[in-house]
């Protein structure tokens, strides 16, 4: 079992912890998250970005992690970035908690996400269905109030 964690921080009061676990390269990865400080009762874009660089805030994280050169999509779509995790839903206090199981996100192997970044966006991800070029790249999910680098843990 390989385990990783990303501690999300940013300048907008959004923060949280994301843990990832994968038993083997063939198995799906379980992603557990608890993120506070978002708007209440909202959906926010949630992605893994290419770089583990947060030196200039979350902008330094680069684009969505996309080793297979696909367009942006929903987590269940065949055509999607590896980093496309869809939206997280917040409760009345602005806290999002949940578990995602994803077969494209890997901690083991050549497309591992270890060392990359998890980013929470300020807007809702349109899942590539927005009908414009930006939708096919980012889902029009907007600014990046919080991010964290994915690192191995025990």
From Swiss-Prot:
Annotated spans, Disordered: 125-144
Major localization listed first in the record, in broad terms: cytoplasm
Keyword Ribonucleoprotein: no
GO cellular component entries: cytosol; extracellular region; mitochondrial intermembrane space; nucleus; superoxide dismutase complex
SS bond partners: 58-147
Family according to the record: Belongs to the Cu-Zn superoxide dismutase family.
Name used for this protein in its record: Superoxide dismutase [Cu-Zn]
């Amino acid at each position: 079992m390989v385990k990783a964690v990303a501690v999300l921080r940013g300048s907008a009061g959004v923060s949280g912890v994301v843990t990832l676990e994968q038993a083997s390269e063939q198995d799906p990865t379980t992603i557990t998250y608890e993120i506070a400080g978002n708007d209440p009762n909202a959906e926010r874009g949630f992605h893994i970005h290419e770089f583990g660089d947060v030196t200039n805030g979350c902008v330094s994280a680069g684009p969505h992690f996309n080793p297979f050169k696909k367009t942006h999509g929903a987590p269940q779509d065949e055509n999607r970035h590896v980093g496309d995790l869809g939206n997280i839903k917040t409760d009345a206090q602005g806290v999002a908690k949940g578990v995602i199981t994803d077969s494209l996100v890997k901690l083991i192997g050549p497309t591992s996400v270890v060392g990359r970044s998890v980013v929470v966006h300020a807007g809702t991800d349109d899942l590539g269905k927005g009908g414009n070029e930006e939708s096919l790249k980012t889902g029009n999910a907007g600014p990046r109030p919080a991010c964290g680098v994915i690192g191995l843990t025990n």
